[in-house]
Structure formats: structure tokens, C-alpha cells
Amino acid sequence: MITVNFLILLLGLVFLVKGSDYFVKSASTIAKKLGVSEFVIGLTLVAIGTSIPELASSIAASIQQASGIVIGNVVGSNIANVGLIVGVAALLSPMKTEIDMLKRDGYIMLFSAVLFFVFAFNRELSMLEAGLFVLLYIAYVFFLFEEAEKYEGKLHFKEFITYFFKFKYINSAMQKLNGNRNRNSDSDRNSDSGNGNERLEGGFAKDIFTLVLSCAAIVIGAKYFVEESIFFAELLGIPDTVIGTTLVAVGTSLPELVVTVSAARQGYGSIALGNVIGSNITNIFLILGLSGLFYPLSVAEMSLFFTTPVMIAISLILLIFISTGWEIKRWEGVVLMMFYVAFLVVLFYI
């Protein structure tokens, strides 16, 4: 019986990860064929592509009111992204860093971790606080895509906070929607009746089928992966927070691991590191935010006093390593990996 449950757990993870991969590819292809702008593709697909497993599993856990799995997944994924993934990538090849990684994305990543810690102090992430996280994520994406020219390249943390509290992202969203609506109207006037058939050619129908199939795989995979994770947590007497922080977190971080290690090995250190930092921001602002919109998320004592402070600490260490010679060296990768191993050891003994 336990063997069957374990196989279902693994199968759910495979469906989750591979389904996410095919979902992003097919959705991106469809969007381009339909003439959707690169901005919208980036906003909806590229920005959250590697975080879809965390998103699906967290929402599935939230619906089942398994708050420990949700928070453990997000916090554990963020720790694994830095300690395990950046550590392994830096060990394979030193990664060049840039000042924007520190003063913009790095500080926003740290801000998201600290803000979650502040919200968690009453042992609950309310639906209002979750909504604020989602707004922060929307503002962050619009800030990156829309404000580069206005700030002449100076897109740092201070500018982001100003941008958010002045609600400039609302104007950006309205302008973008109006612009897309006008372009679509012009396109409709200039098109003929044969365009619909042309879209179905070149594999469009196949892309739609792949999208639907991959979406189903994500939903099914998330459902069974979370259910079996809860089963093993109860069977072994392990808190669901621990299961979420380890098994679920590492399992759903596989896309980040593959992308980051691949980029590092090919010499694209900035892409590798940008993927990790972006994923960590997405995990808290978008995934934790959306998950908290279903039900308020209760915060376990372990999450409040151990795993979340560890997440903040390892984020700080990463920022320090980013600024030392603007390169993450191999020995720094080893330090991050040792930090992660030490975290796991302490986690299972407290």
C-alpha cells in the first residue's frame, strides 16, 4: 500500500513538472500566433514559467486548507533556490553578477521575505495581506517592463516602492489594455475571412490540444502530489510544514534547478541568477498571494521562528555574495550548499 502511495507521489510530481514545461511552451507559441505582444507573454508566461509547479501545488494545498504545505512549499523553495540551486550552479561555473541584481531585484527579493515575516507575526496571512502580495507582484512586473525608459535604466528598489505607492502600475495596465484593444481592432479591419483557417494551420490545433492536455496534467499532478505528501506526513508523524519545506519544495523547484544549472554551464550566469531571484519574488508575491486568496493561511511556529528567518538570512548572504567582486565564486557556492545542508539537518531535529 505504501509503495503504491509513493509511486502516486512520484507520478504526481512528474505530471506537475513535465505538464508545466509543455504548458509554457504551447501557451507561448499560441500567444505569438495570435499576435499577443511580447509584454503580455512575459507578464503571464515567462515571469511565472518555472514557478508553475509551486503555484499549482500551493493552490491545491490551499483548497485543502493545508497551510503548512503552502507556506512550507514557498519558504522551502526559496531556501532551496539559493542554497541548493545557486550553490550547485556556482560550483559548476562562477556566475557573473550585475548591480541591478543587487539594488533592484535583490532588494525586492529581500523585501518580500521580510514583509512576509512581518505579516506572519500574528500567526496568519490574511486574505487582505495576500491580496497586497498579488498587487506587489503585478506592480513589479509592470515596473520591469514599462518603466525602463522613464527611469533611464535606474530601476532600483527605491524607484519600485515609489512606483507602487503612487499606483502607477494601474495607469500602465490601462494604457496597455487600451493599446492592445486598438491594435486588435485595426487587425480585424485589415484581416480577411481566411485568417481563421490560416491560424489553424501550422500546428495551431496541435498547440491548443497540448495546452489543454498539459493544463490537465498540472491539475492532476498537483492534486495527487499534495494528497500523497499529506498522507506521508501523517503516516510518519511529520508536521506538514516540514514536508512542505523539504519534499514538496525541492520537488517543485526542479524546473528552476534545470534552467539555472543549464544556463550556468553555458556561461549565462546572469540569466541563471536572475531566474532564481525572480522565482523567489514570484513565490512570495504571486504564489503565496494567490494561495492566500482562497483561505487565510495559518503560520506554524516553525515557519515563523525558524524557516522564515533562515530564508531571510540566506537571501542576505546571497546579496553579499553578489556584491563581492560582482561574481559568485565556486567557494561561495560551496558555502551556500553547506548552509542548505545544515538547514535540513536542523529542520529534522527540532
UniProtKB/Swiss-Prot annotation:
The chain crosses the membrane at residues 4-24, 39-59, 69-89, 101-121, 125-145, 202-222, 242-264, 276-296, 302-322, 330-350. One of its GO terms (biological process) is intracellular calcium ion homeostasis. This is Sodium/calcium exchanger MaX1. Catalyzes Na(+)/Ca(2+) exchange. The transport is electrogenic with a likely stoichiometry of 3 or more Na(+) for each Ca(2+). Is K(+)-independent. GO terms for cellular component: plasma membrane. Keywords: Antiport, Calcium, Calcium transport, Cell membrane, Ion transport, Membrane, Sodium, Sodium transport, Transmembrane, Transmembrane helix, Transport. Calcium transport is inhibited by Na(+), K(+), Li(+), Mg(2+) or Mn(2+). It is found in: Cell membrane.
